Amino acid sequence: MIEIGKTIIKFPPLIEGILIKRYKRFLADIELDDGEVVTAHCANTGPMKGVLWPGGRVRLKYSPSPKRKLDWSWEQAEVPSHNEKKKCWVGINTSLPNKLIKHLIEANCLERQFGQISSIKPEVVYGLERKSRIDLLLYPSIQNEDSRKIFVEVKNTTWCDDSLALFPDTVTTRGQKHLKELMSVYPDSRAVLIPCISRSDMELFSPGEIADPEYGRLFREALTKGVEVIPCAFGFFIDHITWEGTRPLKSSR
């Protein structure tokens, strides 16, 4: 088990620079600290509310490959924290949260919530019309009292209001559908939503119904219909990511 505050993933040091602009959803121009201006791929196609700061510091991964159109990937952004005297690095790569949560489960960091897990399958087809894919499907060990499969949907969470982490940061019909799909698998299986809070300065999690009122309504309905919510927080550094523990849920308005 990985202790809170300890490293969960290590990687080569990222390259720092200054964000010039983000455009066409997938692209960002960044001036590196040596003065070179590069164009990086931005995996987060949403509005990036609260974390998009032109002139702010960012961190990039350099991974040239003939298979890639761009050699650079935007990984992290430095933003003002709710503590005005501090800043916080935020993970903005939306392909990372599934890997982080899978690491957590494999390291038994969520054993209290899930028990022993014998296997994990990613991107399994499920849902009312069999057209959705669940992020992680967990198969419990035979030692578990609850033998039901566990459907886990992971959401990258970067927006906040003071110390309250919020998801979504815009209207998301896809996210609304995921809540409906989770409700449909209960009670035959367990249904779990994990907001992956990609910053270490948040104290609570709540649905971002200011941005998407319908999502907030469905979120509260899901809670009454057996869907579990386990917000998990992480800290982002230049060469590693730390496990910062779970956060309480604030489901009321």
From Swiss-Prot:
Recorded GO molecular functions are: DNA binding
Q: Where is the signal peptide?
A: none
Highest taxon of the lineage: Bacteria
Q: Which Pfam families match?
A: SfsA, SfsA_N
User: From which residue to which does any coiled coil extend?
Assistant: none
HAMAP family for this protein: SfsA (MF_00095)
Q: Which family does it belong to?
A: Belongs to the SfsA family.
PANTHER family with a match to the protein in the record = SUGAR FERMENTATION STIMULATION PROTEIN A
Spell out the protein name for this chain.
Sugar fermentation stimulation protein homolog
Source organism per UniProt: Prochlorococcus marinus (strain NATL1A)
